[in-house]
Amino acid sequence: SVALHEALPGDYLQMARAAMLDLPAFRRQGWFDAYGEGWATYAESLGPQLGFFTDPFSRFGQLNEEMLRAARLVVDTGIHAMGWSRRQAIDYLNAHTANPPQDNEAEVDRYIAQPAQALGYKIGQLRIAALRERARAVLGARFDLRRFHDAVLGNGALPLDVLQRQVEGWIQAEKAAAKKGVQAPAPKATPAAPLPAAAATRRE
């Protein structure tokens, strides 16, 4: 899960792809948690297709990561909207994940210090997965997973509502191209300056 999330096809691929786009620097190097961490969390779900999670231990680790990202939705909301105490939040993570208690304590302290940041992982993953199913339903046999991924990554980091409009535009372009018997063009990418080193320091 960590390799898929942090490297390929997760954060590293997303940021490297953005750095190559023919966009202003602030767009190539921009960041939205729900998009970036959502993509990286979605990338973990591609593991079985890429030959990962073939043994019970790695599969268990992947499932625990899924549970943690889902539990964050409950705990962060509990702390910042429902009046939960730190102890309540830690107890919830201890009951609903396989993480060591000390890890869950650190997780909760993170949520307290950064309200809503950890929500982006699961929210972004769910939105990208929903867009994928939308594209598959509309395009049918025309749907190409690689081209869908390029549509998601092809404009750099975006707010989720903007991403949804971007993908919807791609779906319509694919439909129109299918009627003409041609392939819709992919977003243009050109070499660009590398990302700043700070981009690789976010904690998962």
Describe the predicted segments one by one:
Residues 1-204:
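N-terminal maturation segment of proteins
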